Swiss-Prot record:
<keyword id="KW-0997">Cell inner membrane</keyword>
<keyword id="KW-0201">Cytochrome c-type biogenesis</keyword>
<dbReference type="GO" id="GO:0005886">
    <property type="term" value="C:plasma membrane"/>
</dbReference>
<keyword id="KW-0472">Membrane</keyword>
<keyword id="KW-0812">Transmembrane</keyword>
<protein>
    <recommendedName>
        <fullName>Heme exporter protein D</fullName>
    </recommendedName>
</protein>
<keyword id="KW-1133">Transmembrane helix</keyword>
<dbReference type="GO" id="GO:0017004">
    <property type="term" value="P:cytochrome complex assembly"/>
</dbReference>
<dbReference type="InterPro" id="IPR007078">
    <property type="entry name" value="Haem_export_protD_CcmD"/>
</dbReference>
<dbReference type="GO" id="GO:0015886">
    <property type="term" value="P:heme transport"/>
</dbReference>
<feature type="transmembrane region" description="Helical">
    <location>
        <begin position="11"/>
        <end position="31"/>
    </location>
</feature>
<dbReference type="Pfam" id="PF04995">
    <property type="entry name" value="CcmD"/>
</dbReference>
<keyword id="KW-0813">Transport</keyword>
<comment type="function">
    <text>Required for the export of heme to the periplasm for the biogenesis of c-type cytochromes.</text>
</comment>
<keyword id="KW-1003">Cell membrane</keyword>
<comment type="similarity">
    <text>Belongs to the CcmD/CycX/HelD family.</text>
</comment>
Length: 61
């Protein structure tokens, strides 16, 4: 199936390619940041620092 995009074909194809590239970069950035945050939380848990959500009401000052 071949589509005729007319005289604006290069603009349309370039726009879709740019949008796809931006989405791919954002997905990569989010995946990298997720791994980084998970690693930081694991390191903090190992060092003994607990999360606020893990504390009970009696632990608060």
């Amino acid at each position: 199936m071949i589509m005729s995009l007319g005289p604006y074909a290069s603009f349309i194809v370039t726009s879709y390619a740019a949008a796809a590239l931006v989405v791919a970069i954002l997905i990569g950035w989010i995946a990298t940041d997720y791994r980084s945050q998970t690693r930081r939380l694991r390191d903090l848990d190992r060092s003994g620092i607990t999360r606020r959500s893990g504390r009970s009401a009696m632990d608060r000052p």
